[in-house]
Amino acid sequence: MFPNYDADNPTEEQAKIGWAGHGHSIVEVSKVGKTGELKREFGPLNRRITATTEFTLVGPAAGSDYVKTSADKTGKKVKGTLNNCSGGITPWNTMLSGEENFDQYFAHAKLDDKKAQESLERFGMEDGESQRKWERFDKRFDVSKEPNEPNRFGWIVEINPLDPKSTPVKHTALGRFKHEAGNIHIASDGTVVCYSGDDSRFCLLYTSPSPRD
């Protein structure tokens, strides 16, 4: 991506380009007659969702002490999404995507709190610098400075592509792990079910049925 890129010494500009390059593109297109081709339209729906876009955290973990940081005392506003994997379209025409392999972005993952340290290790985070060295330019990627920041990733995200002013959401009710996809299916009895796999080694496929209330 960058000529003569030095992985051990990226520049701040390169890091910021990396932040902008992560996430999702919402692109407005139109059909070209019956050719099967699509034409890009420069309409109001086009936008980027990146590693610096504000998300709203919802569900049981939202607002808990585990997701509060120095930049977000509420624990309900998350900056960005990372390493987005497969997803799907919901019956209400929004898009889901899983945050996968987010461990690679965080540095100095060694804490005195035993429970917190076990969580970091469970997700594969280690002491020392991160692969991308983003912690040099934004302290939220340094676990020794922001120990709860990793807890704000590893969720299913939901984006409304038809409302460019909408704030994307992270759903904590669907569990935190290395989400391989987040796909919706409506069962024969009308129950909405979300399917997602944990992309860690030797892990599981999860189903999350709605309570129908």
Locate the predicted segments by residue.
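Conserved beta-propeller blade signature
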Residues: 1, 95-96, 191-196
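Carboxylate/His-rich catalytic cores and anion/metal-binding grooves
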Residues: 12-53, 84, 88-141
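Beta-propeller blade signature
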Residues: 24-29, 152-161
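Blade-edge beta-strand/turn elements of extracellular beta-propeller
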Residues: 34-75, 157-176
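Beta-rich, blade/repeat-based domains predominating
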Residues: 78-90, 176-187
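Structural motif
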Residues: 107, 202-205
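Conserved small/polar residues in nucleotide/adenosyl-binding loops
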Residues: 206-213
